């Protein structure tokens, strides 16, 4: 696919999302706050430029993708889809058929999913959500641990962080990449090199 310049979503949709959806991320842990959702939106629009897709749909899927964290992490992808489906105001910009595709994409974005997303919209947001910057991922993992496991000491946080990194990003880990045009494959190899380099990894704690 030949990349074109990323298109901008409809201003009225952006205004609604900025006022009603983005602020929801303020209550989530630091690894999934407003900086995270804005990054996923930006990366989704960049990836969408490689494909013949609806920019507004891509934008909204990215904006809603983690809203379900309000109900906890385990079912957040399902709850996020429920939140999107229940938002009657989205009918101003999207048809029922579009909303169904969007709900599926939100539901299927989770990194631990064993199957690829069924549509290009799902693959775009899933790939955009995989922000594979080695140092950033380690720091986000540490932040998540500090927020959710405050009783752990330094060594406990280090052990939890290493376990998570290996389980998700290591060789044989559950992370899957879905978009060929993404730079995530190269970045994943860089992260795996960092995971193997224990002295360097320890310096990030």
Where are these regions (language model features)?
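An active-site-proximal "capping" alpha-helix that borders the catalytic cofactor pocket
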Residues: 40-44, 75-90
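Small/polar-rich, solvent-exposed N-terminal microdomains that initiate assembly or binding
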Residues: 18-27
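An amphipathic alpha-helix signature
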Residues: 10, 14-18, 41, 57, ...
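Hydrophobic, well-structured mid-protein blocks that either form specific transmembrane helices
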Residues: 82-115
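His-Asp-centered metal-binding catalytic motifs of divalent-metal-dependent phosphohydrolases/nucleases
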Residues: 55-72, 76, 80, 101-110
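Divalent metal-dependent phosphate-bond-processing catalytic cores, especially two-metal-ion Mg2+/Mn2+ enzymes
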Residues: 5-12, 26-53, 64, 113-205
């Amino acid at each position: 696919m030949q990349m074109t310049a990323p298109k901008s979503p409809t201003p009225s949709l952006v205004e609604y999302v900025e006022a009603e959806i983005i602020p929801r991320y303020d209550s989530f842990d630091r690894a999934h706050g407003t900086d995270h959702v804005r990054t996923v939106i930006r990366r989704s629009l960049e990836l969408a430029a490689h494909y013949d897709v609806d920019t507004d749909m891509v934008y909204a899927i990215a904006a809603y993708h983690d809203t379900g964290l309000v109900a906890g992490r385990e079912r957040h992808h399902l709850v996020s889809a429920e939140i999107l489906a229940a938002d009657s105001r989205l009918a101003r910009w999207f048809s029922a058929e579009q909303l169904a595709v969007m709900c599926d994409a939100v539901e299927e974005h989770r990194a631990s999913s064993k199957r690829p997303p069924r549509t290009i919209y799902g693959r775009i947001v899933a790939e955009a959500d995989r922000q594979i910057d080695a140092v950033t991922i380690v720091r986000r993992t540490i932040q998540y641990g500090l927020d959710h496991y405050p009783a752990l000491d330094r060594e406990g946080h280090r052990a939890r962080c290493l376990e998570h990194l290996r389980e998700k990003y290591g060789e044989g880990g559950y992370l899957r990449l879905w978009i060929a045009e993404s730079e995530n494959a190269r970045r994943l190899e860089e992260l795996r090199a960092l995971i193997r380099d224990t002295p360097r990894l320890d310096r990030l704690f």
